């Protein structure tokens, strides 16, 4: 799957991923009203609203982008109905030939980690048959429990030719409370980056490993260091746009070939219709997905321009 991601990035010339992280408050009123009229102000109604919201955004952007990243918590908050919306979103994005990164941040050990890996990336055995359930192409994983937590995911990645992105240096302000702690003269995130490179060394695609890393756009200097530590690992870069990251901050996340990183924007794209710059173009809540498409185009221009001028 890492090969497909690289190929899609090359074809679209867009090293970006759209984060499908829908809060109900983001959904335009006409969509929410229709869903509530049909299903009531219930978890099912909320799930239908966010599904329709996602579908419209995907329809407006799928030809421009290589991948999407649904954040499962935004769906889980609505219980089983929300997970149905998550599954519909994953399946629909696959119909559009998009790579799906499940932002699930799983982290456990042994059989529990294996069950997470099977559910999100592998096949579950039921009697004489096997099934792919959530069936994402990549999943985000928390490394805090060490190799015991990561190995079950790596094993499934090898078997299914899928991938993971391991949290290394995250974009949130308090990430340094642990991730910047010095151990033998080096910050913890560097040690984790070295383990990512080690875990990924024997599960390579054509150019990059199935085992990638999450490094926040809000920490460009750390990204520069980690790019050298993990030369064969793809970096998923959150924190662009709403969290403050800009194209000029991101050039060191990429290798000299212009590959090696994929930049996520969530609110900056899915809530673009609320921004004044798009309102000034005449975009309203009724045609919100047009703003999402324009935001994707602007993001591609920003990042491509920065890479061309580095």
Functional labels for PLM-detected ranges:
Residues 28, 45-46, 69-82:
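Glycine-rich, proline-tolerant flexible connector loops at the mouths of alpha/beta enzymes
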Residues 65, 134-137, 158-164, 207, ...:
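Glycine-enriched alpha-helix->loop->beta-strand junction motifs that scaffold or abut catalytic
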Residues 250-256, 271-310:
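C-terminal helical cap(s) of enzyme catalytic domains, especially alpha/beta-barrels
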Residues 18, 68, 103, 139, ...:
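Conserved, mostly hydrophobic/aromatic
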Residues 1-60, 283:
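N-terminal glycine-rich anion-binding loop in soluble enzyme alpha/beta folds
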